[in-house]
């Protein structure tokens, strides 16, 4: 079984979605069940409704799952596993207070050495009646694993100490809950971000202590860097939020296409998730950081907009009139996002705001003069844009730039865009909606 294990503590990050996509693809390729595990044990950081938001995003991306579990529902199992480790003398109670540990951390910092927990501290404050934590005994050997992307990764004994499994309130730590659940659901491969590399030796040690003989294969994805700063994209970067990208009008299929493409060798530029299942391979992923490029994502989105079938295009633009499909196709040529396309069609059909667009009083007067001329014309009487244009120029007594700029604004709501002769048939058929001024 493969899994995707998000925490409901904020908006879904593109790095998390990338991991979800890759786990889903490999599960499909290997005909293995796919598990979604909501890691909700950190009650203080959980945000109500974020779990459902994550699931909705996965559905939008075309990702389905065979099983959905909430980690908090397994808390009795986690405590049972901790008790097993205590009985087998693989774990121990530690009574050291947070204040004591903080002093030791400060001492290590002042002495310019890494902080490592010492097992000798476990019972120093036992008589103070602190509720103890449960720690796994530190290993006396190195922990290594062969990462499917990063190759061999090794942690020496002095890099690992006796770490906490259960907190004072008997709630499991992230690494303990994660390791227990991966065993419980027989997870065979974990694809996740490289920020989890330091968690992996701890999870391996927990699984070994619990008697696991089936090592999990790990694949840690390189981080995604911001295109401007070159730094890791954080949750503070708008474009790192999948929700933000969707709200900006990027299609789910285009986002998935892009996240599969970056840092990867792909056989074609534009593809669907189902197509990627046919050829995706972890071996083709680079071990170097990927650079986020919003401009390229926009390009891919433009290509996917062109591939939308008629019914989907009408649905996504909230246009009920099928006679406008041809106009939408023309507008797509100039749009990178669904938001831009919606804006173009809205400006075309809505009353025109010349107050917002006019440059000066003279320009406003030209717009009004042309508007009056246009309202006196029978749009259906002209066989083409050329004959319509000549009559409009004659009636308005305008020409050149003084004519064309007001004309485009009055007919499209925009000062630039698709050639007017191309969209003139749609202007003719919808002139009563098109030729209106905002009050």
Swiss-Prot record:
It catalyses: tRNA(Glu) + L-glutamate + ATP = L-glutamyl-tRNA(Gln) + AMP + diphosphate. A motif ('HIGH' region) lies at residues 6-16. A motif ('KMSKS' region) lies at residues 232-236. Its main location: cytoplasm. SUPFAM superfamilies: An anticodon-binding domain of class I aminoacyl-tRNA synthetases, Nucleotidylyl transferase. Its EC number is 6.1.1.-. It comes from the Bacteria. PROSITE patterns: AA_TRNA_LIGASE_I. It is found in: Cytoplasm. Keywords: Aminoacyl-tRNA synthetase, ATP-binding, Cytoplasm, Ligase, Nucleotide-binding, Protein biosynthesis. One of its GO terms (biological process) is glutamyl-tRNA aminoacylation. It is an enzyme of class 6 (ligase). Monomer. Belongs to the class-I aminoacyl-tRNA synthetase family. Glutamate--tRNA ligase type 1 subfamily. Aminoacylates tRNA(Gln) with glutamate. Does not aminoacylate tRNA(Glu). This is GlutamylGlutaminyl-tRNA synthetase. It comes from Helicobacter pylori (strain ATCC 700392 / 26695) (Campylobacter pylori). The lineage of its organism: Bacteria, Pseudomonadati, Campylobacterota, Epsilonproteobacteria, Campylobacterales.
